[in-house]
């Protein structure tokens, strides 16, 4: 049983969108609401408190605090400030102090640009559009961003001198908490009650949406808890389990990590390098993969057919790892997709 109801949080993208909307309201209406409501990419609307307002010459600024709910997060309590000024036309979003700079390829932001994810950027624009269609320039800054970034993995993925503004849904799920297993178990039981024998497990939002379109309503989002979720599924009597994932998390499973949270380890690049050797890629590409900061960067060095060959090897290794914890009478399948929804590999019984 859950000891408490679990609290969801908001992403840095949602926090920035709220501060941007509040600052624009202050700029155009001279109002300082205690909270603002913002749209999200998944259709939900979030009401988010605003901490403070401030005039800086011609700029109108608002501060919002990031809330991470019950998900352990070094960014919990982070202050994000947006400062707005009028301009002739259009909406211009720029990263200020405390927002990191992208230094390596493979991310969704170009090298040299401020680390504001495209989906988060669109969330900010959508929030502003609810206030005005006039021209406005918004600068987003994080007062302690550079210091706090040292506690994150930003440098490892090629973002320096600040944090990233991220988020695909605006909502931060408590996926790393032990009690989240109760949520997973409950959802597995719901699928069981539908009379399904095949269960689809998806770690994140993108893989979950892909799996729902492909398999229907027998999909459960599992976060980092791959091994535990498979164990729970078997306990509930499922005889066919398919794991659908983006390359990053599934590569961790291929390395033997059944909990993909960063605190348990990370051998993604090493695993991909090994797969590249098995795929007999040329030494130059193997070296590029071995020196990549992220899986996404490594993928950029591969031709389409090379990607499929490489991730077919990864998927087969995942099946080998899973088979060690699953009896032979349970069917297993693995589907690896890109962030754009391209199928990179399909192995096992699907």
Swiss-Prot record:
Keywords: Cobalamin biosynthesis, Methyltransferase, S-adenosyl-L-methionine, Transferase. One of its GO terms (molecular function) is cobalt-precorrin-5B C1-methyltransferase activity. One of its GO terms (biological process) is methylation. It is an enzyme of class 2 (transferase). Gene3D superfamilies: CbiD-like (3.30.2110.10). The keyword Manganese does not apply. Its EC number is 2.1.1.195. It comes from the Archaea. The keyword Transferase applies. It holds the Pfam family CbiD. Pathway: Cofactor biosynthesis; adenosylcobalamin biosynthesis; cob(II)yrinate a,c-diamide from sirohydrochlorin (anaerobic route): step 6/10. It catalyses: Co-precorrin-5B + S-adenosyl-L-methionine = Co-precorrin-6A + S-adenosyl-L-homocysteine. PANTHER family: COBALT-PRECORRIN-5B C(1)-METHYLTRANSFERASE (PTHR35863:SF1). Belongs to the CbiD family. This is Cobalt-precorrin-5B C(1)-methyltransferase. The lineage of its organism: Archaea, Thermoproteota, Thermoprotei, Sulfolobales, Sulfolobaceae.
């Amino acid at each position: 049983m859950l000891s408490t109801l679990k609290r969801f949080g908001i992403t840095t993208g949602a926090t920035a969108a709220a501060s941007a909307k509040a600052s624009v309201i202050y700029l155009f209406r001279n109002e300082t609401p205690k909270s603002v409501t913002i749209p999200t990419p998944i259709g939900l609307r979030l009401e988010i408190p605003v901490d403070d307002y401030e005039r800086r010459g011609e700029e109108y600024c608002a501060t919002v605090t990031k809330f991470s709910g019950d998900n352990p997060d070094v960014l919990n309590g982070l202050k994000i400030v947006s400062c707005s000024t009028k301009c002739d036309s259009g909406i211009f979003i720029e990263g200020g102090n405390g927002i990191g700079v992208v230094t390596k390829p493979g991310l969704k932001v170009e090298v040299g640009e401020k680390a504001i994810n495209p989906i988060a950027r669109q969330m900010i624009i959508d929030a502003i559009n609810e206030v005005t269609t006039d021209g406005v320039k918004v600068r987003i800054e994080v007062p302690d961003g550079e210091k706090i970034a040292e506690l994150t993995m930003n440098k490892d993925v090629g973002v320096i001198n600040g944090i990233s503004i991220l988020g695909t849904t605006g909502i931060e799920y408590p996926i790393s908490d032990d009690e989240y297993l109760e949520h997973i178990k409950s959802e597995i039981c719901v699928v069981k009650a539908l009379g399904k024998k095949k269960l689809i497990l998806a770690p994140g939002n993108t893989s979950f949406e892909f799996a729902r379109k492909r398999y229907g309503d027998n999909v459960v989002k599992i976060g980092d808890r791959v091994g535990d979720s498979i164990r729970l599924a078997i306990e509930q009597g499922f005889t066919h389990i398919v794991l659908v994932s983006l390359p990053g998390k599934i590569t961790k499973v291929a390395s033997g990590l059944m909990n993909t949270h960063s605190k348990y380890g990370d051998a993604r690049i090493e695993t991909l390098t090994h797969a590249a050797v098995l795929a007999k890629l040329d030494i130059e590409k193997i070296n590029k993969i071995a020196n990549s900061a992220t899986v996404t960067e490594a993928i950029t060095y591969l031709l389409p057919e090379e990607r499929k060959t490489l991730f077919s090897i990864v998927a087969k290794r995942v099946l080998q790892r899973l088979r060690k914890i699953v009896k032979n009478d349970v069917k297993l399948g693995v589907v690896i997709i890109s962030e754009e929804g391209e199928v990179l590999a399909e192995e096992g019984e699907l």
